Amino acid sequence: MIRRAKLSITFGVAKAGVYILFLNFRRHRLVLLLIGLAIIVGASLPPFMTASYLTRQQTAAEVRALESLRIMTRGGVLPSEDVVARIESDFPRTKAAALARLIRARIRINAKDFAGAASLLDSSVIGDHSLLADYALFMRGSALEQAGKLPEARAAYEQLLKSYPTSLRAREGALRSANIMLRSGDAAAAPALLKDLAAKDDASALLLTAKAYEQAANSTRALAAYRRLYFYAPAAAEGAESASAISRLGSTVAPAKPDEALARADRLYEAKKFSDALQSYNEAVAKFPAATNSQAQLRRVIAAANTRKIADALNALNAIPASAGDTRAEALYYVAQTYARTKQWDQARATVEELRRSFPSSPFTPRALVSVGQIAEDANNEADASYFLRTAVNSYQGSVEVAQAQFDLAWMSHESKNFSESSRLLTEHLAYYADKNTDNRGRAGYWAARDSERAGKLAEARALYEAMQIRYDANWYGYLAKQRLDAMLRGNKAPAKSFPSDSVVGRAFANLQTVTVAEETAGAKEDKAIATADELNNAGLDDWALEELARASAAVGNSPKVNLAIARIYRFQEDNVRALNVLKKSFPDYSQMKPEELTREQWDVFYPLSYWDVIVQESRARNLDPFQVAGLIRQETVFMPRARSSARAYGLMQVLVPTGMLTAKKYGVERTITEESLYEPRLNVQLGTAYLRDQIDKFGRIEYVAAAYNAGPIRVVQWRTSLPSEIDEWAEAVPFKETRGYVQGVVRNRLQYMRLYDVNGKFRPEVGMRAVTGQSPASGAPATQPEDSTVHKRRVSGDESEE
């Protein structure tokens, strides 16, 4: 009936000021709901939003005016110009005035009053009082261009290039100026303007350069530009024009030199167009055999592996000498995987053995053993899987590359009910691998304890159950561990025992206590980008804001500060899933962090809570725990009221129209149930909680209910009879990975909401009090981290996470 949206996984906004009152927002009810929420925002905004970058302190009234502008322009909406003009006049020579002027220009552009927009933008107010002078200049050029004033537009674009060469709008300004040159009969001037972009093989710049030369009757240079486009930017859409143009100018697309041939192949490879890349590499090798080096042959191997062309992969591998070291090792790694994926196990084993023999110290050797073993495991080839995984673990003990293999071996022992062996291996995983790779840490922690208990190692079991309460108390495996620990203590089955810190259990205990956060890598340049993005968001230009932050992120990786700024914009757009996913790159272990260790804004991204009054009312009406309902909503949609799944489920609790109709009829809800009505939070929660009540009455345990909500009640009826009866084993045995994660998530989310929020839906006092990044909610002072902290700061890739 209800299906989870296909989502990978608000700000309280504040009273927006009197200017909103002038707006007719009947068509925008969401905006009206936000009015009355900029005093709170003004108090919670980061420093760059509450103090001018020009060192002038903003007044409370100006902060409210800025938030009014932000809310007015939310979601692409443009208000009445009169309201915005009033803000501009009431706050002269301020950021509010500058952004109001920019919004007024947007309003006129939207009304096709391009000359009026250009006139508004012909002022120093935006440049003097905001960070958006380059954007204003670009918008002025665009308005002039649309008004047909091409010379003035060209001058504006070229002024942008001169004054703000590093602006994100500079490239587009150059392209537009060049287009104007071609349209105005001044094509000969375009190549010089585009020289820097063309030198970077910018496809649009190369195409315009070629067209400019062709229009200027310089066919030699036109052909050179088209060929450059064909060979050096083949993956771009503009590249499609180059082949026909080359033919039209009397030439062919055959490479004239090795650099051209390899450049085309490399660019296609970088764009992951592996089939085309392989063809280009093969052509390059055939025509210029002496010019292809080992790195090119490696890329040829990888392209062939991705298209499962084993013969091409072997030809390329044979061209890489042993003296190439890790380059040949990496090639062997890909060839071994290709053999495994095509179930040529003998050849896969021979390739891996060559790696072990020739490159025993290369990181690609353990990676090959593990990846081939996992491919065998997925293919139900237990013999080869066991061989490769055991060889990896025995040969590279303690190496991060074999962490997953070691866990897989431990799990094989668990599934074969060899609890003495599985408990040993799982505890060793915690002791020797979990500090390097936390992918399976919580799972290993619980099952190491559970299997130790089954094997009669009660002291070890108790110690590990207790360790799980430190960081996993609000997570699925900590929830299970708490139940087992309570049972042990009630029965007085295991006296407390202290294990030496250097023992296996002692190391395991210690490794269950740590979490990782990304170290802060942002500096002054990124701070300015964040401030610029905030001003763009304030003016309703979210796409440009996200471009600014994407450039900052590319420079500094997973900076918590930059990722929070990105998440802040997504939250403002009510795209809570994207907000969560971007911020967790900086906090991969966020669900194991204590309430005081993250700021309230960070927790609000990870565990948003909206419509609390509705949730409480409807939960009480159905005798449900409102925190459980909130946990289910978070798992379904992360509180996105207009979420829609591929299964055509709608709204916060993902209700299907047919089921909504049946539920409404059963419970006397006198509403017409449609797709649009299911987006209404109250109706959706009313129907969702009614359905949830039915499922609880039917299945009892929330674990079964969650599985039914995600995979359907019929499957759960079958699973309850065919899968293990104990709930911990049952949840592991559910055949759908998505449903396993869903069950765990629903339980985890309830525990998280209970520890973060009080019964009124407000953060508990301790939340954010000792945040490892950001500021203390009480003092506003930078947060400090104690020397003995179990929070480890390091650079993170953004790929690691465990919930």
State each model region's role.
Residues 712-714:
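Structural signature of outer-membrane beta-barrel domains
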